[in-house]
Amino acid sequence: MNYPEHIRDIKLNLLMSENTITIDPSKRKSKFAFLRPGYGLVKQLIKMGAIVTGSRALKCYKINGKQLFDRKPRDWDFIVTEKMAMKICDEHGVTYKDGSIMVLKQMILFRDSSYGDSRVVPTDIQLIVKDELPEYREVDGIRFSELSHIIDEKYKLVSPHHNSMNKHDEDLRQIIARFNNL
């Protein structure tokens, strides 16, 4: 599939057309999310201003009343500043030196032990550390990454240099198909 062409068309359409883009924050979690271990950390991140991004944020977006994405997200992706990440680490007794977190390409991964990684909380939560927070939309006190930013990041993840191509490839195909059917 020629992703650059489709992504360019989508981004131009988002900029130039009169589509109504809304966010339904209730779509970010299941009805029983509060029962999952680690949900306290999710609430803490939202309260401190972390930006929800990735598949979970995509699931919340609607264009002209139609949901753009419907895959059930398995993890939480947040964009945070280094200061925010350090605060979370301090509050959970985690340091870079103790091996409890992995730092890969500016991402701090809090992973479930079933993946073989050290864990802080038994829910997949990825903190993507940036020098500055990207543009976002805030709805009901929750910050969501801009739709174009999420699509750009998904595209970067299907480049030949990444291993997690299948999930992100399928996500982009779904977004393109649904966007073309608006």
Residue ranges and their predicted role:
Residues 2-12, 90-101:
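Short N-terminal secondary-structure initiator segments
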Residues 2-28, 74, 118-182:
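Catalytic cores of NTP-dependent nucleotidyl/adenyl transfer enzymes across multiple folds
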Residues 26, 34-38:
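Signature of uroporphyrinogen-III synthase
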Residues 38-89:
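Active-site nucleotide-donor binding segment shared across nucleotidyl transfer reactions
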Residues 47, 93-97, 180:
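Residue-level recognition of short, structured coil/turn motifs
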Residues 70-72, 97-101, 163-164:
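Short, low-complexity, polar/charged sequence segments that are solvent-exposed and flexible
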Residues 93-136:
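Conserved catalytic core of two-metal-ion nucleotidyltransferases
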